[in-house]
Amino acid sequence: MWKAVMNAWNGTESQSKNVSNIQSYSFEDMKRIVGKHDPNVVLVDVREPSEYSIVHIPASINVPYRSHPDAFALDPLEFEKQIGIPKPDSAKELIFYCASGKRGGEAQKVASSHGYSNTSLYPGSMNDWVSHGGDKLDL
């Protein structure tokens, strides 16, 4: 039981699961997703640009939650003006992550409440990605 609690806390569950209707992914799931290069999936790193510039999951976009908590409530033109990239299509799956899962979960809720019906979370986020060597993979 304690191991399951620690795995949940650290985001290192060995399989994906759906909690409270929010799909969440493990490191192995994320590795497969990144390797597929699916144009219908958008990886959303919600850390600040200074964190993102150090290390991030390949092909992810940076939408910083702390400095832009309501970014997904913005219209597309204002989103692009403030964030510097086009606003993701609401028909795509958005997978949110941050450093440890907290900001990613918060940003996922904001996006869900503003018309994004296919949102997911990588709860282990960058801590899990780096601890499993994801930053060293050639994807």
Swiss-Prot record:
Domain Rhodanese intervals: 37-138
Catalytic center residues: 98
Pfam families: Rhodanese
SUPFAM superfamilies associated with the record: Rhodanese/Cell cycle control phosphatase
Keywords from the UniProt entry: Mitochondrion, Phosphoprotein, Transferase
Signal peptide coordinates: none
Function field: Thiosulfate:glutathione sulfurtransferase (TST) required to produce S-sulfanylglutathione (GSS(-)), a central intermediate in hydrogen sulfide metabolism. Provides the link between the first step in H(2)S metabolism performed by the sulfide:quinone oxidoreductase (SQOR) which catalyzes the conversion of H(2)S to thiosulfate, and the sulfur dioxygenase (SDO) which uses GSS(-) as substrate. The thermodynamic coupling of the irreversible SDO and reversible TST reactions provides a model for the physiologically relevant reaction with thiosulfate as the sulfane donor.
UniProt name for this protein: Thiosulfate:glutathione sulfurtransferase
The organism of origin for this protein: Saccharomyces cerevisiae (strain ATCC 204508 / S288c) (Baker's yeast)
Organism lineage: Eukaryota, Fungi, Dikarya, Ascomycota, Saccharomycotina
Gene symbol of the encoding locus: RDL1
